[in-house]
Amino acid sequence: MTDIGAIEPTALKARLDRGDRVFILDVREPAEIAVAPFPGASHIPMGDIPSRLTELDPDRETVVVCHHGLRSAQVAMYLARMGFERVLNLSGGIDAWSETADPTTPRY
């Protein structure tokens, strides 16, 4: 199993607020994103990642997001196996983001 790093929602928010250039990859389904969008994120559903891998930059720092952090962890591990060296999973997903970093994001 490939080890991946994780980032807490509050740490990601601080980095984004500072203007750090972090690529946010949201792997949720379109219906989930419609309920609780992550501003500025690029959206590729988890099941489409292998066929759309060439759309992603393996050299860019990437934070992968889903609802609770499980799908995003799987995608982050896959990306790491594919040679992405700067990939992180958002701990707790958009749900934890809403709870701890941005309460204006709806919870579902």
Over which residues does each language-model region extend?
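Rhodanese-like catalytic fold shared by cysteine-dependent sulfurtransferases
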Residues: M1-F23, P30-E61, L70-Y108
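Short, surface-exposed ligand- or partner-binding patches at beta-edge/loop junctions that are enriched
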Residues: V65
